[in-house]
Amino acid sequence: MNTDSGGCARKRAAMSVTLTSVKRVQSSPNLLAAGRESQSPDSAWRSYNDRNPETLNGDATYSSLAAKGFRSVRPNLQDKRSPTQSQITINGNSGGAVSPVSYYQRPFSPSAYSLPASLNSSIIMQHGRSLDSAETYSQHAQSLDGTMGSSIPLYRSSEEEKRVTVIKAPHYPGIGPVDESGIPTAIRTTVDRPKDWYKTMFKQIHMVHKPGLYNSPYSAQSHPAAKTQTYRPLSKSHSDNGTDAFKEVPSPVPPPHVPPRPRDQSSTLKHDWDPPDRKVDTRKFRSEPRSIFEYEPGKSSILQHERPVSIYQSSIDRSLERPSSSASMAGDFRKRRKSEPAVGPLRGLGDQSSSRTSPGRADLPGSSSTFTKSFISSSPSSPSRAQGGDDSKMCPPLCSYSGLNGTPSGELECCNAYRQHLDVPGDSQRAITFKNGWQMARQNAEIWSSTEETVSPKIKSRSCDDLLNDDCDSFPDPKTKSESMGSLLCEEDSKESCPMTWASPYIQEVCGNSRSRLKHRSAHNAPGFLKMYKKMHRINRKDLMNSEVICSVKSRILQYEKEQQHRGLLHGWSQSSTEEVPRDVVPTRISEFEKLIQKSKSMPNLGDEMLSPITLEPPQNGLCPKRRFSIESLLEEETQVRHPSQGQRSCKSNTLVPIHIEVTSDEQPRTHMEFSDSDQDGVVSDHSDYVHVEGSSFCSESDFDHFSFTSSESFYGSSHHHHHHHHHHRHLISSCKGRCPASYTRFTTMLKHERAKHENMDRPRRQEMDPGLSKLAFLVSPVPFRRKKILTPQKQTEKAKCKASVVEALDSALKDICDQIKAEKRRGSLPDNSILHRLISELLPQIPERNSSLHALKRSPMHQPFHPLPPDGASHCPLYQNDCGRMPHSASFPDVDTTSNYHAQDYGSALSLQDHESPRSYSSTLTDLGRSASRERRGTPEKEKLPAKAVYDFKAQTSKELSFKKGDTVYILRKIDQNWYEGEHHGRVGIFPISYVEKLTPPEKAQPARPPPPVQPGEIGEAIAKYNFNADTNVELSLRKGDRIILLKRVDQNWYEGKIPGTNRQGIFPVSYVEVVKRNAKGAEDYPDPPLPHSYSSDRIYTLSSNKPQRPGFSHENIQGGGEPFQALYNYTPRNEDELELRESDVVDVMEKCDDGWFVGTSRRTKFFGTFPGNYVKRL
């Protein structure tokens, strides 16, 4: 007996097969609607079974099958149907009315679950030992013209089974099931290999297709049976009734309604001896890197596991049809590796590409090619492809490549050349590829491993040290290690120099050479986009980084070793060899390395190449310039002269770089010299010319520092260079990788000042400056300079003529500096430890700080009842020095000099402003006072300051707070809020808590006891005050304009002593402040010029003697003699109105020498009386 695919037994004369009880699952993936008008499937089923019942169930063997556990299950078509009934056909046949019996010819074995609504393209037909009473299958029958069919629920029940068994269908022995017209229905032919069929369906289910490639799964589509290989209408064969019909297979996932893809139609049948459950593990081929930085071109494992021909064929197929996701790509190539032969013609890509020929010989239309990506140079399962991008071999328009068989017409034979290129590891240039618009280099893994010694194995980001180390000694053919467009597009043959132009949009052929040579072309001749792209992205790092501008210790050491090889000191020893360094050169190398390390601690070595011409002669390893240029200069300049025949030609590049350095041309070849850091000064002073550096914000901060010579490097680098007699290029030597916004403010500010000076500067005069004073000129000048190299004998002979001009310029600069220092010192803002302060102190004597002011006077013993004398016993100027106390502060603070007279009469308690309890010397107190004097002028006069006593220690936590200790006197300036005062202590102003101090009741004005007046010699006249005069001391008489004064005596030529009638006020006042209206004849004759010491000392010395002992060296007899003569050594300009002006060689009669270093005397030249610094005069 035999069984058909439906599981029903029938008699066959051909063979006898033993039945085995195996559960069988089959499905029909392509069930499509065949027509609009058909009868009800229920009636069709009944009519068919009435005609030929043994076709459905088998005639004589039904009982035997039932006994073995197989039941005949017929669908019970319920009356609940859609209004539109569609006739069901199998396999998309679009013929006339076809009987649906062939669809229902197999009994159902229901599954344990219901089908999802989304997977309703077919009904799974299954045998089972136990059947449920009823189960619904929802089938959407679709018509050919795209209209939606009806959902037909299928029910099975025992009642319907009994009704169906009596129906018979027409039977044609030997032909198989037929429709009403007698045409055999479609019978599956692959039942002998069920696993292969289910595997194909499983792959179609789990494949993610391109959006829009297929229509909605519910839309009607027509696929003729001739285009499928799974089903075809034919008569019964041996495979229909084979024993494989009952082979047990696992229950599959219900397949979706997916039309067969064009690639699947051409799949060949797998061999019977293949493993039945063989699955392709794609993880080893598709192990994607975790990040893009781990990706290494050429290291994909697919290159080691698959054949290049298969790679190429599948890549061509993929290049013409790009799937939209990595999942579909993975599925496509997984099937192709299993089903397609290794070598074969390309399959047609559906109806769209069926007319195309194999692109192996297809003509590529040159630069007007419509292919986006032409040739795939790697496996489809490479990591980059798994991420959705194609690493493809780019032909025009951006870059051209020709292999061994490349032709200018651009035929696709270069694909074959590329395959041959993969097999030539030694003599091949890296293929230039593009990924998403950026270049990447991909090459076979075998080539990378075989050429690792001579070719750089990777193209990736490299450090500066690695880029600098890849030199001609290490690599005979160095490669550009850069990601930039310019460097990858511009790879050239490094063994012979040729003019480089930008990549031509046409494929070029280089005869006699297996490598394509990409040539540069001027940006102005290239298309507009390429020109713009060049200006944006052209940073050829081979030109930039393979220079001898070395910036690290490692690079310096390698450079030093290379120079030793050039000199022949190492006798063939190379830095790349494993041999030890010769023993005799070790000490020299160590000392040299120490120097290099010391140099590397400072800024990068500017190098001699900064002032040397550009090396236009190509070196041995190709185009390797000797210096680094700015990006702007590389972008703006045209193609430089790079051919050896053009190298000797004099040229001068006027680039558009805003910052340039012009170097003169007459230069003698210099022998290589090593300058240590100590030689810098000598080298710097060898040059006699300066040139201003024009710049803009493009200049980096390091360039500015280079200009201002702040580096500790010698001006000449330690690299060996070849100099040529021609004009130099103007270039910005820049070690900055980009713009430095941080340096913009400082640099542009200096540039404004520089350009303003530059417009008014005399160039010939500047060129004649003496080099001997160049260091001082650099110190003095605030403008950065760049030296010109002038080593010609003509310039050296002119050095002797420029000393006078340099001296004049320096004298003017020093004068400005002195004026500035003096102004700063007068304001008190010049620190004592500043270099300018020390410089001036060497030129002029230090003016002593005055303790003979009013505040010092109030610290004298006459104020001891209220203000005790400091413990250091500081002595003060005698009271008769009326000029000493006129101003309260020393000469170091001229901004507070003329403002304290207006409150001189109210100094009773206000003069206790200074903290007398402080043990510090009064000089420091005056210094602190000077810092707060400006605040006093701003509206807080000392009479408004309220004294307060600190009841607790307070330590300032911030700079705004004021520290003091318990018992200190603090002067309150104002009240900040309810908790804080602003006050003054020791000359410092700050805030402190209110609760930390206790206000003091202001005492009565503390006026010293006035000495009894001497015997009056008689009135000498009367005078009227012309101006207001405020007394600074208690011996002076304050005047108001218009006051009438009785003149008692003439103290000296500058002072009168008098009194105001009607009051007890008496004192001295300046002669110039009053106008004499009445003069007694006797008094005028008796005292035409009264002796100053006698009359002056009678009042003042009495005051001194009544308070403290008289100083040694100052006696009454000395005063009687008119003073001790001194001669002025320097000019002194008064800074306060009580000071005496001195001119050099003036003779001054000194009346008193104060302990603070100031003298009191009268100038014989001007007849003025005042104070002056004691170190400005010498004894005669």
From Swiss-Prot:
Residues 367-384 have a biased composition (Low complexity). Ubiquitinated by CBL. Residues 943-1002, 1018-1079, 1121-1180 form the SH3 domain. One of its GO terms (cellular component) is focal adhesion. The modification Phosphoserine is found at residues 27-28, 40, 130, 143, 239, 319, 325, 328, 339, 367, 377-379, 381-382, 384, 463, 574, 577, 630, 633, 829, 923, 1097. Residues 237-247, 261-285, 933-945 have a biased composition (Basic and acidic residues). Keywords: Cell junction, Cell membrane, Cell projection, Cytoplasm, Cytoskeleton, Membrane, Phosphoprotein, Repeat, SH3 domain, Ubl conjugation. GO terms for molecular function: protein domain specific binding. Its main location: cytoplasm. InterPro entries: Endophilin_SH3RF, SH3-like_dom_sf, SH3_domain, SoHo_dom, Znf_C2H2_type. It is found in: Cytoplasm, Perinuclear region; Cytoplasm, Myofibril, Sarcomere, Z line; Apical cell membrane; Cell junction, Focal adhesion. The modification Phosphothreonine is found at T357, T372. It holds the Pfam family SH3_9. GO terms for biological process: acetylcholine receptor signaling pathway; Notch signaling pathway; regulation of skeletal muscle acetylcholine-gated channel clustering. Residues 83-92, 216-232, 314-328 have a biased composition (Polar residues). Residues 166-230 form the SoHo domain. CDD domains: SH3_Sorbs2_1 (cd11920), SH3_Sorbs2_2 (cd11923), SH3_Sorbs2_3 (cd11917). Residues 25-60, 73-96, 216-285, 314-392, 911-945 are annotated as: Disordered. PANTHER family: SH3 DOMAIN-CONTAINING, SORBIN AND SH3 DOMAIN-CONTAINING PROTEIN 2. Interacts with ABL, CBL, DNM1, DNM2, FLOT1, AFDN, PTK2B/PYK2, SAPAP, SPTAN1, SYNJ1, SYNJ2, VCL/vinculin, WASF, ABL1/c-Abl, ABL2/v-Abl/Arg, ACTN, CBL and PALLD. Interacts with PTPN12 and WASF1 via its SH3 domains; this interaction may mediate the partial PTPN12 and WASF1 translocation to focal adhesion sites. The first 2 SH3 domains are required for WASF1-binding. All 3 SH3 domains can bind independently to PTPN12. Adapter protein that plays a role in the assembling of signaling complexes, being a link between ABL kinases and actin cytoskeleton. Can form complex with ABL1 and CBL, thus promoting ubiquitination and degradation of ABL1. May play a role in the regulation of pancreatic cell adhesion, possibly by acting on WASF1 phosphorylation, enhancing phosphorylation by ABL1, as well as dephosphorylation by PTPN12. This is Sorbin and SH3 domain-containing protein 2. It comes from Mus musculus (Mouse). The lineage of its organism: Eukaryota, Metazoa, Chordata, Craniata, Vertebrata. The gene is Sorbs2.
